[in-house]
């Protein structure tokens, strides 16, 4: 039986295993034929959306991996707007509204509120937090 999952990522792109475990879990789900309705990045997890992350050449580029996965499987990558702004992750619209020089949110990621997470949770068979 194929299930629909929502993933909640609260860990940063580097420094803990939360985000990388979420990514590997997502890949495994998709390979088994399950569906991911949404990946929601909250708290420190919003750092996964920062396009200015520049890992060493011998390190796994997790933000780019999320983008590739989302592109391949058409998965929304939602980023909590309040958590993102507190941590300096902004899209073009927020950069303009806040009077900032530029944005740093990677493509495929989009700002949204906790309401988007709540809506997704109502339709998913499983919600898994990392």
From Swiss-Prot:
GO MF annotation: an example: sulfur carrier activity
Organism per entry: Proteus mirabilis (strain HI4320)
Entries under PANTHER family matching the protein: PROTEIN YCHN, SULFURTRANSFERASE TUSD
Active site: 80 (cysteine persulfide intermediate)
Pfam families in the cross-refs: DsrE
Top enzyme class: transferase
Quaternary structure (record): Heterohexamer, formed by a dimer of trimers. The hexameric TusBCD complex contains 2 copies each of TusB, TusC and TusD. The TusBCD complex interacts with TusE.
Entry's Gene Ontology BP terms: tRNA wobble position uridine thiolation
Compartment annotation: Cytoplasm
Annotated GO CC locations: sulfurtransferase complex
Name of the protein this chain belongs to: Sulfurtransferase TusD
